[in-house]
């Protein structure tokens, strides 16, 4: 894998690889965040088991009226034919009139490597076109290979647990995070919350990282434990996949 990872100052790339492969935990919750204003993040999707309404297991982002971007590992062990995609949600246990529910007609992967947590992105084609408006809207994509500088402020969000032993929240949570470049890889955007234990964790994989109003990351994994203060949180870098995404979207047009 030489050449695949940048070498952060003072960190050998093979040490970073060992940490990622040996200590990665796929992300699923927002630790230390707060409740989002209802329906203020209209691009956020909830992936649920069709037989169990409200059974959120991963997040996603609407990037086109017929497509949701999520993490590839979300459907590694679950058939996409058993999944319902919910848009326009805030309270997952409430029958909100804003909610729109879809099945999946097709999935598109891009060389996902689960051993090294690379290319952790997956496109879900919905069975019909979403009705766009105030509560359901499409997120903006970055330019191909667009980068984020150290210190960029972003927003992570999801319905994952509020702590390791805490229950799963009913309502959407969000957290202000800061982009960091140490202990990161070119395939990822990495973030920390300075000076406090907060971040992503078990249960909200696939959810968005929004920076300057643009979708820059897909919630992917953490190293060793959640909100450790030692390692950043890892998101799949959306800007690496924009050309691939656009090719999929063009190919799906009638």
UniProtKB/Swiss-Prot annotation:
May form dimers. Interacts with CD177; the interaction tethers PRTN3 to the cell surface; the interaction is direct. Interacts with SERPINB1. Interacts with ADGRG3. It is found in: Lysosome; Secreted; Cell membrane; Membrane raft. It comes from the Eukaryota. This is Myeloblastin. The keyword Protease applies. Its main location: other. The active site is at 73 (charge relay system), 120 (charge relay system), 205 (charge relay system). Keywords: Cell membrane, Collagen degradation, Disulfide bond, Glycoprotein, Hydrolase, Lysosome, Membrane, Protease, Secreted, Serine protease, Signal, Zymogen. It catalyses: Hydrolysis of proteins, including elastin, by preferential cleavage: -Ala-|-Xaa- > -Val-|-Xaa-. The keyword tRNA processing does not apply. Residues 30-250 form the Peptidase S1 domain. Residues 1-27 form the signal peptide. Serine protease that degrades elastin, fibronectin, laminin, vitronectin, and collagen types I, III, and IV (in vitro). By cleaving and activating receptor F2RL1/PAR-2, enhances endothelial cell barrier function and thus vascular integrity during neutrophil transendothelial migration. May play a role in neutrophil transendothelial migration, probably when associated with CD177. Triggers inflammatory processes in neutrophils by interacting with ADGRG3 upstream of F2RL1/PAR2 activation. One of its GO terms (cellular component) is lysosome. PROSITE patterns: TRYPSIN_DOM, TRYPSIN_HIS, TRYPSIN_SER. It is an enzyme of class 3 (hydrolase). The lineage of its organism: Eukaryota, Metazoa, Chordata, Craniata, Vertebrata.
């Amino acid at each position: 894998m030489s050449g695949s990872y940048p070498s952060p100052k003072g960190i050998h790339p093979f040490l970073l690889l060992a940490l990622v492969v040996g200590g990665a935990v796929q992300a699923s919750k927002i630790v230390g965040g707060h409740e989002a204003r209802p329906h203020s993040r209209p691009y956020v999707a909830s992936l649920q088991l069709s037989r169990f309404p409200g059974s959120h297991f991963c997040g996603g982002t609407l990037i086109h009226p017929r497509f949701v971007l999520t993490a590839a590992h979300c459907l590694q062990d679950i058939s996409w034919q058993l999944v319902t995609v919910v848009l326009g949600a805030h309270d997952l246990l409430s029958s909100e009139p804003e909610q729109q529910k879809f099945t999946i007609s097709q999935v598109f992967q891009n060389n996902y490597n689960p051993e090294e947590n690379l290319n952790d992105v997956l496109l879900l084609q919905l069975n019909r076109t979403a009705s766009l408006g105030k509560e359901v809207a499409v997120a903006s994509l970055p330019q191909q290979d667009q980068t984020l500088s150290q210190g960029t402020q972003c927003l992570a969000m999801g319905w994952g647990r509020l702590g390791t032993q805490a229950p799963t929240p009913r309502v959407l949570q969000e957290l202000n995070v800061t982009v960091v470049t140490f202990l990161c890889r070119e395939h990822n955007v990495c973030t920390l919350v300075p000076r406090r234990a907060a971040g992503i964790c078990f249960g909200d994989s696939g959810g968005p990282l929004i920076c300057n109003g643009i979708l820059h990351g897909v919630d992917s994994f953490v190293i060793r434990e959640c909100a450790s203060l030692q390692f950043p949180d890892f998101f799949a870098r959306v800007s690496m996949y924009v050309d691939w995404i656009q090719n999929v979207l063009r190919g799906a047009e009638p």
